[in-house]
């Protein structure tokens, strides 16, 4: 199919800009009725009123798409997922219903450790096949760019294997989503390094970072900076070393306790800090000053029955807030964009407009891609979502139900049915 596309009779709904929108800016959307969007070789070349040339047959080398007044949004950017893994952890859901916490399950050998074992047992082919199946479900909900993390290997071989699976999927023209790889070797402490976290950080720096740089396997380095996992100092040391190897810093921060991860993210100039359920006021203010994107994951708080991150407070403090699914096999086995919208609006007090910005332009900024995706503007990729309605407020209103009619990736059409 050609990557030349003309979309007409669309209701364009988009944030604007080539960087993250902060604070009050998040509520500002451009809305164009009866609009045309032109895509040439996968790149947007025109956004504006309907053109007579469409009727006159000027675009005879283009695919034509009549949006019939439906909303046309930027493709959704899911900037925090763990979609490459082996096994499943369905039994943990029942354990949590009986009162066990995420950390108590992890400490008794469940949680991440059980996924690590299952992932280490899978071949490249089986790991890739499982990941591709999850991606297909996610793209049907309008996701056109997704971040993926390693972190279920915790050894040299399997950490690299996860990253190579993502690279393989990214090169496959049949996969309808761009994948942004993140190295999360510091996701948990493996049994081989039990009670030796400093030695494990040394191992990651010595054995993995040079290979990841050499083979261009990741763009970011993430760390689970949390009490009982990796300390502030250990996180600082790894992320600083990763920067020397060309990887940009991200953090799982202040998810379980207010450890100071948000403050560390600001100190290091991290691209994003994620979770932030227990981020302090000082941490939020520091992130706002330094331009660290606050990536909030409402599906995880929902699944764990935890308090939601203070999205409203973060926006009011001037933060750039992004939303993501945190799809993973344990704490949140869901890639539901519709439910993410609903929970963010209901429990984090985001407006619908702010939530749209959070799942498009600010999600792109959390992946260092706001210059090329995340809004419908000339020069950006032709990644779009067509809703089933001319009213974008259905995004949270359809609680958990998919309201995406068609996903358009690089100018190519993919109906959601």
From Swiss-Prot:
Cofactor-binding details, from the entry: Binds 1 zinc or iron ion per subunit.
Origin superkingdom: Bacteria
Residues binding 4-imidazolone-5-propanoate, per UniProt: 89, 152, 187, 255, 331
MF term (GO), any: imidazolonepropionase activity
One cellular component term from this protein's GO annotations in UniProt: cytoplasm
Pathway: Amino-acid degradation; L-histidine degradation into L-glutamate; N-formimidoyl-L-glutamate from L-histidine: step 3/3
Enzymatic reactions: 4-imidazolone-5-propanoate + H2O = N-formimidoyl-L-glutamate
Cystine pairings recorded for this chain: none
A Gene Ontology BP annotation from the UniProt entry: L-histidine catabolic process to glutamate and formamide
Record's keyword annotation contains Zinc: yes
Pfam families associated with the record: Amidohydro_1
Residues given in the record as N-formimidoyl-L-glutamate binding sites: 152, 328, 330
Plastid in keyword set: no
Primary role: Catalyzes the hydrolytic cleavage of the carbon-nitrogen bond in imidazolone-5-propanoate to yield N-formimidoyl-L-glutamate. It is the third step in the universal histidine degradation pathway.
NCBIfam families for the chain: hutI
Protein name in UniProt: Imidazolonepropionase
Organism: Bacteroides fragilis (strain ATCC 25285 / DSM 2151 / CCUG 4856 / JCM 11019 / LMG 10263 / NCTC 9343 / Onslow / VPI 2553 / EN-2)
Gene expressing this chain: hutI
